[in-house]
Amino acid sequence: MSQPVKIAIAGANGRMGRAVAQALEGRSDAVVAARFERPGDAGEGLVARETALAAAEAVIDFTLPEASVALAEEAAANGGPALVIGSTGFSDEQLDRIDAAATKIVIVRSGNYSLGVNMLMGLVRQAAAALPAQDWDIEVFEAHHKRKIDAPSGTALMLGEAAAEGRGINLAKVSDRGRDGVTGPRKDGDIGFSVVRGGGIIGEHSVIFAGESESLTLSHSAIDRGLFARGAIAAAVWVKGKPPGLYDMQDVLGFKK
């Protein structure tokens, strides 16, 4: 039997850090090797970031974009460990820096680590390809808890990208994210985004295909935060032995052709 993958947890005291630690309890294929927070943060069981990186084969990181970029660059400079990044809200410049780090180490980055959402992406891509833009409008709806700081969510953007891929277009050219006041009629082919923030909503996502006489809605609801933790752990186990590069959850699940 192979040895369990040694995992370090970034942002260990956060909601997702705690969820990852809980999800690792009792597993035979992965184990907590270290827990760490931001430099200067102290707490029981926490170690310095450099100590955590040295102890781990993979780091699971649900923190903030700037922290994830710094972590990726430090890991790349040291030749590892692998990273599983679940942070969202990156700028283009930050994504470029993660891409550069992925030339030296294995990085899995995804806006959502759930099986259901990744299945939903395929359904959205298929529906978008089958339903012509002149007859069917696409709207991505998402709702999250009031503490989430980025919008649209990383998952909503993934779903928008899937819809754009299905239609063979660039999402950046058709994305409509800010409706307020007199906006005029909707443009054919636009992919709209609607956002709700409130309470303790874990994550609700729907993609609406709206025609003149009928509509189709594809949806996913997160019941508990542990599903994201379990998916990230699956990714951390999957990276073992993989060559340096940038991967996503579609790779982990074998959904890519």
Swiss-Prot record:
Keywords: Amino-acid biosynthesis, Cytoplasm, Diaminopimelate biosynthesis, Lysine biosynthesis, NAD, NADP, Oxidoreductase. NAD(+) binds at G11, A12, N13, G14, R15, M16, E37, G86, S87, T88, S110, G111, N112, Y113. The active site is at H144, K148. It catalyses: (S)-2,3,4,5-tetrahydrodipicolinate + NAD(+) + H2O = (2S,4S)-4-hydroxy-2,3,4,5-tetrahydrodipicolinate + NADH + H(+); (S)-2,3,4,5-tetrahydrodipicolinate + NADP(+) + H2O = (2S,4S)-4-hydroxy-2,3,4,5-tetrahydrodipicolinate + NADPH + H(+). GO terms for molecular function: 4-hydroxy-tetrahydrodipicolinate reductase; NAD binding; NADP binding; oxidoreductase activity, acting on CH or CH2 groups, NAD or NADP as acceptor. One of its GO terms (cellular component) is cytosol. It is found in: Cytoplasm. Its EC number is 1.17.1.8. (S)-2,3,4,5-tetrahydrodipicolinate binds at H145, G154, T155. It is an enzyme of class 1 (oxidoreductase). It holds the Pfam family DapB_C. GO terms for biological process: diaminopimelate biosynthetic process; lysine biosynthetic process via diaminopimelate. It comes from the Bacteria. Pathway: Amino-acid biosynthesis; L-lysine biosynthesis via DAP pathway; (S)-tetrahydrodipicolinate from L-aspartate: step 4/4. Gene3D superfamilies: Dihydrodipicolinate Reductase, domain 2 (3.30.360.10), NAD(P)-binding Rossmann-like Domain (3.40.50.720). NADP(+) binds at R38. InterPro entries: DapB_C, DapB_N, DapB_N_CS, DHDPR_bac, NAD(P)-bd_dom_sf. Belongs to the DapB family. This is 4-hydroxy-tetrahydrodipicolinate reductase.
